[in-house]
Amino acid sequence: MSLRDKLNELHERGLAEIQKSTDLKDVNQVRVSLLGKKGPITEVLRGMRDLDAEERPKVGAFANEIRDDLTAALTKRREELENAVLNARLAKEAIDVTLPGTPVAKGEPHVIQQIIDQIEDLFLGMGYQVLSGPEVEEDKYNFEMMNLPKNHPARDMQDTFYITKEILMRTQTSPMQARTLEKHDFSQGPLKMISPGVVYRRDTDDPTHSHQFHQVEGLVIDKHITMADLKGTLQVLAHELFGDKFDVRLRPSYFPFTEPSVETDITCFNCGGKGCNVCKNTGWIEVLGAGMVHPNVLKMAGVDPDVYGGFAFGVGPDRFAMLKYGVDDIRNFYLNDVRFLTQFTKKG
């Protein structure tokens, strides 16, 4: 039998063995047995040395064709088996898309965040900036630049979590007044900003107090700002949050960083201003503190109080939420009880 005949026989036998392979291991074994260094094709090619010079290149070229054809057949069979394995796995792990899916619970903004978002949207529409500041604050900004020097008796009104003698957990969002006033360029226009955030007090948690709660600081500084501007702004805020039927009343009060200072009341939710046990028969409920910015606060921030003035106010979203929805215990907002919180969502 000539070498060409032997190669033809190996070619036919090899193709048959490749086709009979049932897994990738079989394919690899056939490859080694046919094309390996000790395989029959290699053995046949060793006999080429006995051929004459004219026949040798022809047989060599034919042998390479056989080798290439077997290699292509091995590659094709390997791909067929790999696809078969993949298809079997996909069939086994198939998902029936006609079955109803498991619903994923959708989150909703917390009721207090809803109040904050409503306040932000209102003041953004009025041209205010919304700024945020650090919760770990310097004594300088939290107290001193708010007209509360060391040993000032008004500091006792705000029991404070101190980290060091000069670093504390802010007791109010008012420090953003000082931080913003320091940087503002009044040649570019007036300063109008609100600053929502979390504040901390060393209070014992009870139905109306929490050691951690929210505030929204408001500040407007420009020439010729008056108390009428403050009252008008608070009236708009009350109408936005509670409705047009609620009126605003200002009462004299004291805050170190404003002069004059006022407590702001709105019409009682329960009786509509007629007087009841909720409002202690006054027809009004206190909701926030405000006032005209104290000249000392302006001076310490490098602003001339003879040229510029303005007003500031501090809103408590937690208290607003309690009043708006008739919640009698502030702690309920922080217990993560979905049954309670869902009342204040679209789903509730």
Curated annotation (Swiss-Prot):
Keywords: Aminoacyl-tRNA synthetase, ATP-binding, Cytoplasm, Ligase, Magnesium, Metal-binding, Nucleotide-binding, Protein biosynthesis. Transmembrane segments: none annotated. CDD domains: PheRS_alpha_core. It is found in: Cytoplasm. GO terms for cellular component: cytoplasm. One of its GO terms (molecular function) is transferase activity. It holds the Pfam family tRNA-synt_2d. PROSITE patterns: AA_TRNA_LIGASE_II. It comes from the Bacteria. It catalyses: tRNA(Phe) + L-phenylalanine + ATP = L-phenylalanyl-tRNA(Phe) + AMP + diphosphate + H(+). One of its GO terms (biological process) is phenylalanyl-tRNA aminoacylation. InterPro entries: aa-tRNA-synth_II, aa-tRNA-synth_II/BPL/LPL, Phe-tRNA-synth_IIc_asu, Phe-tRNA_ligase_II_N, Phe_tRNA_ligase_alpha1_bac, Phenylalanyl-tRNA_Synthase, tRNA-bd_arm. Its main location: cytoplasm. This is Phenylalanine--tRNA ligase alpha subunit.
